[in-house]
Amino acid sequence: MFPMVTEFMNYGQQTVRAARYIGQGFMITLSHANRLPVTIQYPYEKLITSERFRGRIHFEFDKCIACEVCVRVCPIDLPVVDWKLETDIRKKRLLNYSIDFGVCIFCGNCVEYCPTNCLSMTEEYELSTYDRHELNYNQIALGRLPMSIIDDYTIRTILNLPEIKT
């Protein structure tokens, strides 16, 4: 008779424990009910990136001295620097500079180690294309100034959202 009573007690304890676990899960679900939604409607709303966000690289052609430090510190030897040695002034003259963003890992080493600060990271992250060859940016495409998300009037940022009345 005692084994049946102990089995019944164990069954009751397991039932109470299961109900407690279900209640804990339900309380967590209810605690999320009064939070603001995290999802943004992407093409029309964008998150404002942080100050140190590593997006598309901006290149200033006039500042570059063709030292190729960016190529040496890049883990995948990505930037292509074409230069010509000017014999009369004994300096390098930059002819072409390009980066393939289809291969770039956005580590930021080139920006960090550039001695003339001709490279900088922007907050631009929309680089998707239908053709991978369009991701190979030359010095003209790299020199294009990025439009700030805050200044873009077609985009509603999280800061510009109407307040939700509670």
UniProtKB/Swiss-Prot annotation:
GO cellular component terms, semicolon-separated: chloroplast thylakoid membrane
Membrane topology reported for the UniProt record: Peripheral membrane protein
Cofactor: how bound: Binds 2 [4Fe-4S] clusters per subunit.
Domain 4Fe-4S ferredoxin-type: 55-84, 95-124
Molecular functions (GO terms): 4 iron, 4 sulfur cluster binding; iron ion binding; NADH dehydrogenase (ubiquinone) activity; quinone binding
Enzyme Commission code: 7.1.1.-
Gene3D superfamilies: 3.30.70.3270
Localization terms from the record: Plastid, Chloroplast thylakoid membrane
Catalytic activity: a plastoquinone + NADH + (n+1) H(+)(in) = a plastoquinol + NAD(+) + n H(+)(out); a plastoquinone + NADPH + (n+1) H(+)(in) = a plastoquinol + NADP(+) + n H(+)(out)
Binding residues for [4Fe-4S] cluster 2: C74, C104, C107, C110
GO annotation, biological process: photosynthesis, light reaction
Cofactor field: [4Fe-4S] cluster
Family matches, as InterPro entries: 4Fe4S_Fe-S-bd, 4Fe4S_Fe_S_CS, NADH_quinone_OxRdtase_chainI, NDHI
Task performed by this protein: NDH shuttles electrons from NAD(P)H:plastoquinone, via FMN and iron-sulfur (Fe-S) centers, to quinones in the photosynthetic chain and possibly in a chloroplast respiratory chain. The immediate electron acceptor for the enzyme in this species is believed to be plastoquinone. Couples the redox reaction to proton translocation, and thus conserves the redox energy in a proton gradient.
Subunit and interaction comment: NDH is composed of at least 16 different subunits, 5 of which are encoded in the nucleus.
Protein name per UniProt: NAD(P)H-quinone oxidoreductase subunit I, chloroplastic
Naturally occurring in which organism (per UniProt): Enydra sessilis (Smallray swampwort)
Taxonomic classification: Eukaryota, Viridiplantae, Streptophyta, Embryophyta, Tracheophyta
